[in-house]
UniProtKB/Swiss-Prot annotation:
Keywords: Nucleus, Repeat, Ribosome biogenesis, rRNA processing, WD repeat. Component of the RIX1 complex, composed of IPI1, RIX1/IPI2 and IPI3 in a 1:2:2 stoichiometry. The complex interacts (via RIX1) with MDN1 (via its hexameric AAA ATPase ring) and the pre-60S ribosome particles. It comes from Candida glabrata (strain ATCC 2001 / BCRC 20586 / JCM 3761 / NBRC 0622 / NRRL Y-65 / CBS 138). One of its GO terms (molecular function) is chromatin binding. One of its GO terms (cellular component) is rixosome complex. This is Pre-rRNA-processing protein IPI3. The keyword Coiled coil does not apply. Belongs to the WD repeat IPI3/WDR18 family. It comes from the Eukaryota. WD repeats lie at residues 79-126, 130-169, 188-227, 249-290. GO terms for biological process: pre-replicative complex assembly involved in nuclear cell cycle DNA replication; regulation of DNA-templated DNA replication initiation; ribosomal large subunit assembly; rRNA processing. It holds the Pfam family WD40. Transmembrane segments: none annotated. Its main location: nucleus.
């Protein structure tokens, strides 16, 4: 098991490994906008090019990894952000590494949102003026049912994915709009500990802005059915707004943010360094542990100010004043953050074109990654970091099976005109997955092979259990071990007899010794 790291700068792109020296430079890659690269399945990497209406496709799958561009996909205009909505309903197959996800979302600097179907290349919908200014990030969550966009207009908008793919003639409308920030919202994060439904999920949304604040929202205050109640939603907008739980103020403008998978901590990158904010805050010197992202009964927004830890801090007094003492992991200006699989290390990208692999517990820099180039990269900031786990043995075995197939099918071209969902033909090119070997074994089991027969057998077993008396199946250990115990008793008797003989012999020897000792004393006394 290894972790693959792909990162881009304004002029370069590099694919490397976190635990080895393997490196590959992705050629003809230039992107100056953050969140403009996305991994599509386990095979492809999409990178939106700067100042070009073009998406470069790279093959990054194991032995077939190529440094050159595999394919170029033209787009209607320059794309700044990309996001993939995975097809979570597909069964696992033996060639899952080569399956394509379902939707590709792209945004522009003018605030538009494009939605393509990757298997056909059809442009399903275009949302004009989704934001008043450029979109900085697109984030899908809850298995792609919803996605969130943040923009330079200081707004955060929640969308429902089905509105972009349905045959409804009306254009997609947002579920809710958050406008608590004052400047550009650079990053957003959604907690992974949530339920299946939005209204009862308990999911937390974190937003980071250049106004030096991080805001935490609770999605549980959203209703579950959004499309049927559009009119009532417009009449009572507050009812559909997520609840603002807490606001954290930092000493500098926030550029990037990363949330721990278990919601234990929030890592905030600013122009002055990287801060570690524990969401379960322990007040040193006391037994108090505060859940900073928990809803309070007063329905009031909690305000906290983050300060750097010192030697003589009175944590109890500072916490009573709303100040949180946090550790500063690194002092380099941060542009991009990404946690590793086990969340023990964090990759910190800076504006100098380098990535520092920092161990969170010790605050030590374990490794430094930078592009393999002779050009001056002092002002070549990191724009994208993608970390994925790689099972080398499984990947190599799959690739060997398909090594002889040289006729690789190209990806469908992304359409420039919105697809007519009512009259036009909808052709989808899709590679049918092979059934894995373990699925045949599962199909032979009773519940899957014949469910009705399995339920009949369960009913008959239940009837027998209820009508018959309970019989004990406990073994009588004493009865079974009776012959063995009898033989053991004979051995014990023999040993006891031998022991008695030894005791009697010892007693005789002792008496003889005592008599001889008395005679010896008498002899000594007579000689005196």
């Amino acid at each position: 098991m290894d972790e693959s790291v792909i990162f881009t700068t304004e002029q370069n792109a590099l694919s490397t490994s976190l635990y080895s020296a393997e490196q590959a430079v992705l050629r003809q890659c230039s992107t100056n906008s953050r969140n403009s690269a996305v991994r599509v399945g386990d095979k492809y990497l999409f990178v939106a090019q700067s100042n070009k209406a073009l998406i470069n496709v790279y093959n990054i799958s194991g032995a077939h990894k190529r440094e050159t561009v595999e394919q170029r996909l033209p787009t209607p205009e320059v794309i700044t952000c990309l996001e993939v909505i995975q097809n979570r309903y597909e069964e696992k197959s033996a060639i899952s590494d080569f399956e394509l996800p379902h939707l590709l979302l792209g945004s522009t600097d003018g605030g538009k949102i494009y939605c393509w179907e990757l298997n056909s290349g059809a442009l399903l919908s275009v949302k004009q003026m989704a934001h008043y200014q450029g979109i900085t990030k697109i984030k899908s969550f809850m298995d792609g049912k919803y996605f969130i966009t943040s923009g330079k207009d200081s707004r955060v908008i929640v969308w429902q994915t089905i509105d972009f793919v349905s045959n409804n003639a009306s254009e997609p409308k947002p579920i809710c709009i958050l406008h608590d920030h004052n400047l550009t919202v650079n990053d957003i994060a959604v907690s992974m500990t949530h339920g299946a439904n939005m209204s009862t999920s308990g999911a937390k949304l974190f937003t980071a802005s250049e106004d030096s604040t991080v805001r935490c929202y609770d999605f549980s205050f959203l209703r579950g059915d959004f499309r049927k109640n559009r009119k009532s939603q417009e009449q009572d907008q507050k009812m559909y707004q997520p609840r603002l739980l807490a606001t954290f103020t930092f000493p500098a403008a926030i550029e990037a943010m990363s949330l721990d998978p278990a919601d234990r901590a929030l890592y905030v990158g600013t122009s002055e360094g990287l801060f570690s904010l524990p969401l379960y805050y322990t007040v040193k010197g006391t037994s108090t542990v505060a859940n900073l992202a928990q809803a309070s009964g007063s329905n009031r927004n909690k305000l906290y100010s983050v300060v750097i830890s010192g030697h003589d801090d009175d944590y109890k007094k500072l916490f009573s004043m709303g100040q949180l003492v946090c550790d500063k992991l690194i002092s380099t200006p941060v542009t991009k953050l990404e946690l590793t699989f086990d969340a023990t290390t964090i990759l910190v990208g800076n504006k100098f074109g380098r990535i520092s692999v920092v161990e969170i517990a010790s605050k030590q820099i374990l490794k430094t990654l930078q592009p393999l180039t002779t050009a001056d990269t002092e002002e070549d900031a990191i724009t994208n970091i993608i970390v994925t786990t790689v099972n080398n043995s499984r990947q190599d075995s799959i690739l060997e099976q398909h090594q002889s197939n040289k006729n690789v099918q190209k990806l469908p071209v992304l359409q420039r005109v919105v697809h007519d969902k009512d009259h036009a033909e909808h052709e989808v090119w899709y590679r049918a997955p092979e059934t894995p070997e373990f699925s045949h074994e599962l199909e032979s089991l009773p519940p899957i092979a014949d469910f009705e027969k399995y339920m009949d057998s369960i009913r008959s077993e239940e009837t027998v259990f209820l009508t018959t008396e309970t019989t004990s199946q406990v073994k009588n250990v004493k009865q079974e071990l009776a012959p063995a115990s009898h033989s053991n008793s004979q051995e014990q008797q023999e040993l006891q007899q031998e022991l008695q003989q030894v005791k009697s012999a010892y007693k005789e020897l002792r008496e003889l010794h005592e008599s001889l000792f008395k005679e010896h004393e008498q002899l000594l006394s007579s000689m005196k």
